[in-house]
A protein has these predicted regions:
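Terminal, low-structured helical/coil segments at or just beyond the last alpha-helical repeat
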Residues: 298-344
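Alpha-helical junction/boundary sensor with strong preference for TPR arrays
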Residues: 255, 261-262, 296-299, 303
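TPR/TPR-like (Sel1-like) alpha-helical repeat modules
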Residues: 283-300
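Positively charged n-region of N-terminal signal peptides that target proteins for export
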Residues: 1-4
Length: 344
């Protein structure tokens, strides 16, 4: 009996270790290239915590990668580095698989798109079922532990049929994959990464879109909310860049796009009020100012005064008829409340 105890103890440890082994990264994802502007992106969803920290990789002007199933996370940075060296997507995939000496390699799933639109995919024979992939002219959709092939097929169809920029096409693909059944285990996390040269916010940032939902009962709803915010900020930045170049038409177009993603942003309505006036549309200008006032009535006057100091908009102050409509009855904006301070 005593001789059996060590063996039983070892067996228990082995069983415990096996139970603690992380499951495969079951997911459905899409990698894609936008030939119109060179954007590259990945969108992914899974019944797996924080899938965005594992699956999506991308570099502007280089390529995008999704690595999943019995995942080798190293495939992501390795693939990007090889693409930077000038290898095609197909050459990179071949090299990754040749150099992967781990025993679980047959369970891998990976998709690569390079900056020229070349696509390479691999779904190993041991990838958790159902596993597979489908390709289009500019995209590859793939997944494992799915309800069936209808998931990547629906994703590709939605991608091709959706109008607009890459972010919208990727999101539509994810939603279609979910509607087709998605991950057979359910929902938990989602992520989207899109890269564009100098497309990110602030300086030296190529991440045009980078949003993650790590743990949420409805990750698609939350991903949509974050995407709207991300794109609203992107177009807001575009508006200010156009303003700095005295491009009022471009600034208004960017502001209108920002407003479509964030309709309750007081600052955007305020800018649209000034821009419409400067471009000769006083009716729309008053409408936008009215929306800005409704959203933040307490400090509308101060906000208007701050923005009207711009040389682009000072002429509005001399337009008495317009000012009376904007600040009835005498056309004089309210003085800032000194008690509230400059940040109110």
């Amino acid at each position: 009996m005593r001789r059996l105890l060590p063996a039983i103890f070892i067996l228990m440890l082995a069983t415990l270790a096996a139970a603690q082994t992380l499951p495969p990264v079951a997911t459905f994802s899409i990698v894609a290239f936008d030939p119109q502007n060179g954007d590259l992106g990945v969108a992914v969803a899974s019944r797996y915590f924080s899938v965005g920290s594992v699956v999506p990789w991308a570099m502007a002007g280089v390529g995008a990668v999704a690595t999943q199933a019995d995942v080798n996370v190293g495939y992501g940075p390795q693939a990007i580095d090889l693409l930077r060296q000038g290898l095609t997507a197909q050459e990179v995939l071949k090299k990754l698989l040749e150099e992967d000496t781990f025993e679980d390699k047959p369970g891998r799933q990976v998709a690569i798109v390079d900056a020229k639109g070349n696509i390479a995919t691999y779904t190993g024979p041991n990838a958790p079922k159902w596993a597979g992939d489908r390709q289009g002219k500019t995209w590859s959709a793939q997944g494992n532990i799915l309800v069936g092939p209808q998931v990547p097929e629906a994703m590709g169809k939605a991608f091709d049929e959706t109008q607009g920029e890459l972010a919208e096409k990727l999101f539509a693909a994810l939603k279609a994959g979910d509607a087709a059944g998605g991950d057979a285990r359910g929902k938990q996390s989602a992520s989207m990464l899109i890269v564009r040269k100098r497309g990110g916010r602030n300086m030296n940032n190529d991440r045009y879109v980078y949003i993650n939902v790590d743990d949420n009962p409805d990750p698609f709803k939350e991903l949509r909310r974050l995407l709207d915010l991300n794109l609203s900020y992107n177009y807001g930045d575009k508006m200010y860049k156009a303003l700095s170049a005295n491009d009022l038409t471009g600034a208004r177009a960017a502001a209108q796009k920002a407003n479509s993603y964030s309709p309750n942003n007081r600052g955007i309505h305020l800018q649209l009020g000034f821009l419409n006036y400067a471009l000769g549309d006083k009716v729309l200008s008053l409408e936008e100012f009215s929306k800005a006032r409704e959203l933040r009535p307490d400090d509308f006057g101060k906000s208007w005064l701050d923005e009207s100091d711009s040389p682009l908009f000072k002429s509005m102050r001399d337009d008495k008829d317009f000012m009376k409509k904007l600040f009835p009855p005498d056309g004089v904006p309210p003085a800032p409340d000194a008690k509230k301070g400059s940040n109110q």
